[in-house]
Amino acid sequence: MSLYHAHKGKRIPIDQLKWGEEMEYQLGVSICDPDGKSSRMKMSNRGPELIKEFNTNPVAAASKIVLMPEFGGWMIEAVPTEPYMSQIDPEILLSCEKQISLRRKVLTEFLKPYNHFITTMPNAPALGT
């Protein structure tokens, strides 16, 4: 609120306004039983380790994705490397969903060798307050 009150009433050129989006994923691991006939899923706390590995991987730079830690070791946040610009351009607005899908695909492929997966869960905006 203090940021809002500090800037309310000021004219800010539209080209200085930027916006973005983020996706928060829960990190899971698939554990196979020794007999190899069944598996179970558990939440993984390897988030910080996998985030560091991903962000130093050339795939991350090429796909313009940055991962950051979220609430616990089992949550990660994926954001674009740069914010969207402020122009109300339909192409930019329509690219948002495509970028979210691309991030999920890249991250899913990255996690396969680690036997990990990601899930998302829609939440009410005020859930964390």
Predicted regions and their residues:
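Terminal catalytic/cofactor-binding subdomain
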Residues: 1-129
